[in-house]
From Swiss-Prot:
It is found in: Cytoplasm. Belongs to the CsrA/RsmA family. This is Translational regulator CsrA. Homodimer; the beta-strands of each monomer intercalate to form a hydrophobic core, while the alpha-helices form wings that extend away from the core. GO terms for biological process: bacterial-type flagellum organization; mRNA catabolic process; negative regulation of translational initiation; regulation of bacterial-type flagellum assembly; regulation of carbohydrate metabolic process. It comes from Thermosipho africanus (strain TCF52B). The keyword DNA damage does not apply.
Length: 73
């Protein structure tokens, strides 16, 4: 993991087209701005983890239900 120190107004560039800028520091909270191409998803980690959890739940399948799945109605 790369660890950097930044001050308000300073930025970090990732690749050629992603910029992370420090906008405000207030106590223990830091406000950042992220400029990235529209095709790059930018999510808070807790939201990303929740989406992964929901996706895993959505694909759970109980094999015991398989025989009835193909019955003609």
């Amino acid at each position: 993991m790369l660890v950097l120190s930044r001050k308000i107004g300073q930025s970090i560039i990732i690749g050629n087209d992603i910029e992370i800028k420090i906008l405000k520091i207030d106590g223990g909270e830091i406000k950042i701005g992220i400029e990235a191409p529209k095709d790059v998803k930018v999510l808070r980690k807790e939201l990303y983890e929740e989406l992964l959890k929901e996706n895993k739940e959505a694909v759970k399948f109980d094999i015991k239900n398989l025989p009835g799945f193909f019955k003609k109605k």
